[in-house]
Amino acid sequence: FEGNRSAGAEIGHMVIRAGGEKCACGRRGCFEAYASATALIRQTKRAMDKDRASQLWKICPNLEDVDGKTAFDGLRAGDKTAEKVVKNYIAYLAEGIANLANIFRPNAVVLGGGVCAEGDTLLVPLRRKVNRLLYGGTKYAPVVLTVATLGNDAGLVGAARFAMQNC
């Protein structure tokens, strides 16, 4: 989707929480500020700061080394702090996806990026939550959530293809 002067479709800057976290764009509450890998890392660090007894500290003893996997590793280790971080992350991701699905009602939503490497640990609860948030529930058929086969390179390949078609 492309708007006037090739602008628009900046879904990362759709507000999902009014007055929320400050986004890199300067607005508050943007989808990207809650459901990106950067947001997951920020929330993991905050949670670790608040809970010095969390197993996350054993998984990643240095806050500077926290990455998009850290909270999921903690979840798999049974850490309650990590579980809360992942649950919140999935809730925000689901909210944004459901908002878009309620507008466009696609057959499928294809996710990309490093966090998608978490597979079913991410996708199973995300699918359940998204389909619960859809207008009319699954009456109109659930939205299929899947991971891009190009993984973390999907954006790069898409940008290259766009450039080849438009330059």
Regions found by a protein language model. Name each.
Residues F1-S6:
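Hydrophobic alpha-helical segments and helix pairs
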Residues A7-I16:
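Short, intrinsically disordered, charge-biased short linear motifs at domain edges
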Residues V15-K22, R27-C167:
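ATP-binding/phosphotransfer module of carbohydrate and carboxylate kinases, centering on a glycine-rich
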